[in-house]
């Protein structure tokens, strides 16, 4: 039963029974399993607090076909990393005909790939940092010549800053490349941008207030994102009205360029000239106590339970093709 994406069918739901039986997918097998467990349990508790018939479902332990045999009517995806937010799961759910939250197959796959996101963003007029693809040692010297030191090496399709390394000396580039390429074959380098980091959460086609992030660590890495208590978040971010509006518009444009939808986040660095540069988009952001989307939602009066409800509403845009109403 093939699903089709119909954004015009997005609707506000007032009765929890309208959602039916909901599976919250979390855990999985990626390097971000630990964070997914935190996110999924928080989402599960919040949905149940609103009267939704929600159940835990870990695809590491259960086949996805159990979604059909257990008669789940829709899925709240709280899986992070490869296999969860890269289009793989979304494609499987499309084949099963089970509506799900957030971006579809293409938007998820592109959003997980930082390189393709950057290329599409540039084509859409969204600024992003220069970059060099690293395939081996022959690329090291040209990368340093073009980007200068320090620079940062990134695996293209890992989330939560997994595998990223700041490189200050040329002799450290081989080990940084080895760390990233041990996770995947697509690796690239960017110049180190010493400015401030901002993020913009997106929900149902609207950009929420930006958040400025300050960490005592070298950069906003896995530990700083989820476990440190000395990372500081500012919402309002301190930007003027014009700069704030510009940043939100860039976030929406980047999300649209990648074909992403429903909810998510766009991350930026502000360079020395005050120009925001897109780092990446995230189509299934964390939903933990340290997470940024819940923080931005609170700034506009949306509590955590309401946020999980609003995200679940995005599943109504995925409908079986044969049941979709005729387009006007």
Model-derived features: where do they sit?
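Hydrophobic beta-strand scaffold residues
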Residues: 54, 99-100, 128, 151, ...
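Phosphate-binding site of ATP-dependent enzymes
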Residues: 168-249, 270-277
């Amino acid at each position: 039963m093939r699903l089709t994406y119909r954004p015009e069918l997005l609707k506000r739901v007032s009765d929890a029974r309208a959602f039916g039986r909901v599976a919250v997918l979390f855990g999985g097998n990626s390097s971000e399993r630990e964070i997914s467990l935190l996110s999924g349990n928080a989402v599960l508790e919040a949905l149940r607090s609103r009267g939704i018939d929600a159940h835990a479902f870990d695809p590491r332990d259960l086949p996805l076909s159990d979604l059909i045999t257990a008669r789940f009517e829709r899925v709240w995806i709280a899986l992070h990393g490869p296999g969860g937010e890269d289009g793989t799961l979304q494609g499987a759910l499309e084949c099963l005909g089970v509506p799900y939250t957030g971006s579809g197959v293409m938007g998820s796959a592109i959003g997980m790939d930082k390189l393709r996101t950057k290329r599409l963003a540039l084509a859409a007029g969204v600024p992003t940092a220069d970059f060099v693809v690293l395939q081996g040692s022959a690329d090291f010297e040209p990368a340093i010549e073009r980007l200068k030191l320090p620079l940062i090496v990134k695996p293209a399709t890992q989330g939560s800053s997994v595998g990223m390394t700041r490189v200050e000396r040329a002799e450290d580039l081989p080990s940084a490349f080895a760390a990233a390429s041990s996770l995947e074959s697509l690796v690239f380098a960017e110049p180190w941008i010493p400015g401030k980091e901002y993020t913009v959460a997106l929900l149902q086609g609207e950009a929420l207030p930006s958040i400025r992030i300050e960490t005592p660590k070298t950069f906003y890495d896995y530990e700083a994102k989820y476990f440190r208590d000395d990372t500081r978040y500012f919402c309002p971010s301190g930007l003027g009205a014009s700069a704030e509006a510009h940043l939100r518009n860039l976030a929406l444009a980047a999300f649209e360029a990648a074909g992403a939808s429903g909810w998510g986040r766009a991350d930026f660095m502000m360079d020395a000239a005050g120009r925001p540069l897109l780092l990446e988009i995230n189509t299934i952001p964390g939903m933990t106590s340290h997470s940024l989307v819940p923080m931005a939602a609170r700034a506009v009066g949306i509590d955590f339970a309401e946020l999980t409800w609003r995200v679940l509403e995005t599943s109504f845009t995925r409908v079986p093709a044969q049941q979709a109403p005729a387009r006007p």
